[in-house]
Amino acid sequence: QALENAGAICLGKTNLDQFATGLNGTRSPYGVCTSVFNDEYISGGSSSGSALSVAKKQVCFSIGTDTGGSGRIPAAMNNIIGLKPTKGTLSTKGFVPCCPSLDCPSVFALSVKDALEIAHIAFSDSKKDETLRYDFLRGNFQIQKIKERIKIRVPEDKQRNFFGNKEARRLYENLLEKLQEDDIEIITIDFSMFLEA
């Protein structure tokens, strides 16, 4: 409701793995969702339709769910951002529970900035909603605070092995570019001791 109050327009509902239980996007009576990159690839799930609507640029953001990866997995497999906020920061009122201690709305967007902006708008501290934590502050969604804490370590370029899969290399490099565009610090590390194991 907070998103609609802020001017968001709901365009519809999307497909997902039945009962939101599946991590590949192929378990739906309404058809299989496939990757934005290739119809031969799975989309990831369970919130596959939510992820694909953003990845295909049909919408600028969408809302899904995430208990054990249902938001983050299809986001990763379709090269978009999948944000699972801290449990209790966004309301789960109206959710059919799968695991109440882990269930959470997820936000899909094309950038970290957009995902955090949506989470910031959707944030509520209503004392009437028993699914929310009251010790979490709206200011915690400030993107600069979050970016300052994120550092991603990756192997040196010569140590990255994609086993001849040019598409995998391209997707990996696209992800690194997208993270750097969002001012996320990428640190190159020597991965040789793991390669020798």
Tell what function each PLM region has.
Residues 193-197:
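Short, intrinsically disordered, charge-balanced linker/junction segments flanking boundaries
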Residues 1-3, 179:
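Conserved hydrophobic/aromatic pocket- or pore-lining residues that grip, position, or stack substrates
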Residues 164-190:
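Acyltransferase
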Residues 4-119:
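Short glycine/serine-rich loop segments
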Residues 12-15, 65, 132-135, 189-190:
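Beta-strand segments within the central parallel beta-sheet cores of soluble alpha/beta enzyme folds
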Residues 1, 44-45, 170-171:
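Residue-level recognition of alpha-helix initiation/capping sites
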Residues 84-173:
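A short helix-breaking turn/cap at a secondary-structure junction
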Residues 11, 153, 185-192:
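General small-molecule cofactor/ligand-binding pocket signal
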